[in-house]
């Protein structure tokens, strides 16, 4: 990558350009649920012991995958006027995946993007951006083939503010994305190794809002807060990516005590998220399993022993909330961490 300034029409602008290339090969040996299950008896009395399968006689599937990527990119940051900046750029991408029975190749994929920033005054600035999207992925369909890259476009507008001489910053953004080949769980279908199969959803749309504020709003008192809300749907209007919570809120604050206690900083926060769900295969067919909305609180304290050394204690999941971080994957649910305490000693050279 190279970056440098240049002058045109009496104004100073900036040019950036570069290139990348990667070549990846992988051999995957996959074994499904081919051995005979052994009864464990009463589940509540099970000790976890289970006889080891006869791996030598277990058949497997060998998949060879070869992925090649290359591309070049460039962008110009135009200084159109004192309060107005325009960024125009593009990326040219080549992508190829060869998996024996499956082959996909995309040559010279042109991906333009543009953005504009306008400084309304010394406090506020507004911006807008447009980006084309092309993201290779490794998800596989029920036949074991890698899904084609996700492609589409994203538009965003926002407003940023810098307050208290730049010590406190806030922003709000609205986004709208249209994507094709978005990986979705193919309920009831699995790969030979037992992992979930996926299908590519097309004509999808995702839109939402993000708010963020962080910085020192009073001497020694810092705040970090944010919230987001989005919707996502298929072309037919059905819910998309239900395993991702639609709304999240996070708040954390720290305060450095004044006077003789100035070496001590205390803080706390809370993270909240809305419900999420995912398909799982039950005895009577596919079902939706999920986790309701929940909040996790935390506390911290840090003491600066010297200008270079400090000791900190963090208490996570303060109220020992029991919750799931994932549901449905391999027809199972994973608990989040219970209440835990971590002590850290840090030293800066």
Regions found by a protein language model. Name each.
Residues 1-100:
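Face-selective signature of the C-terminal outer-membrane beta-barrel domain
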Residues 1-5, 67-100, 109-135, 213-227:
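Surface-exposed extracellular loop regions of Gram-negative outer-membrane beta-barrel proteins
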Residues 2-4, 72-78, 114-118, 157-161, ...:
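Residues on the lipid-exposed face of transmembrane beta-strands in outer-membrane beta-barrel proteins
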Residues 10, 83-86, 122-126, 165-170, ...:
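Repeated loop/turn-to-beta-strand initiation elements of outer-membrane beta-barrel proteins
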Residues 15, 242-349:
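Conserved C-terminal beta-signal and adjacent last beta-strands/turns
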Residues 19-27, 92-96, 130-136, 163, ...:
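Transmembrane beta-strands of outer-membrane beta-barrel pores
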Residues 81-83, 176, 199-281, 319, ...:
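Gram-negative outer-membrane beta-barrel transporters
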Residues 126, 150-216, 228:
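Membrane-embedded beta-barrel scaffold of Gram-negative outer-membrane proteins
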């Amino acid at each position: 990558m190279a970056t440098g300034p240049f002058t045109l029409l009496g104004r100073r602008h900036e040019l950036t350009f570069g290139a990348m290339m990667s070549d990846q090969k992988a051999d995957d040996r996959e074994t499904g649920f081919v051995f005979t299950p052994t009864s464990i008896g009463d589940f509540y009395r099970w000790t976890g012991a289970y006889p080891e399968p006869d791996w030598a006689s277990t058949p497997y599937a060998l998949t060879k995958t070869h992925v090649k990527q290359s591309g070049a990119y460039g962008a110009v940051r135009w200084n159109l006027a004192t309060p107005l900046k325009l960024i125009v750029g593009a990326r040219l991408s080549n992508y190829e995946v060869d998996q024996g029975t499956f082959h996909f190749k995309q040559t010279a994929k042109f991906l333009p993007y543009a953005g504009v920033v306008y400084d309304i005054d010394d406090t506020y600035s507004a911006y807008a951006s447009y980006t084309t999207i092309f993201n290779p992925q490794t998800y596989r369909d029920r036949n074991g083939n890698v899904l084609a890259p996700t492609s589409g476009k994203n538009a965003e507008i926002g407003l940023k503010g810098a307050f208290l001489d730049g010590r406190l910053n806030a922003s709000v953004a609205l986004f709208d994305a249209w994507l094709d080949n978005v990986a979705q769980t193919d309920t009831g279908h699995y790969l030979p190794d037992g992992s979930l199969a996926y299908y590519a959803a097309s004509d999808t749309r995702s839109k939402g809002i993000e708010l963020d504020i962080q910085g020192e709003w009073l001497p020694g008192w810092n705040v970090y807060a944010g919230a987001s809300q989005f919707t996502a749907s298929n072309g037919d209007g059905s819910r998309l990516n239900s395993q991702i919570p639609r709304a999240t809120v996070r708040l954390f604050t720290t305060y450095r005590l004044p006077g003789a206690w100035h070496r001590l900083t205390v803080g706390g926060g809370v993270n909240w998220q809305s419900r999420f769900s995912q398909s799982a295969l039950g005895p009577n067919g596919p079902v939706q399993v999920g986790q309701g909305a929940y909040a996790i609180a935390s506390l911290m304290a840090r003491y600066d022993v010297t200008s270079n050394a400090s000791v900190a204690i963090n208490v996570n999941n303060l109220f020992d909330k029991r919750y799931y971080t994932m549901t449905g994957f391999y027809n199972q649910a994973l608990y989040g961490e219970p209440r835990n305490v971590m002590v850290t000693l840090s030293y800066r050279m």
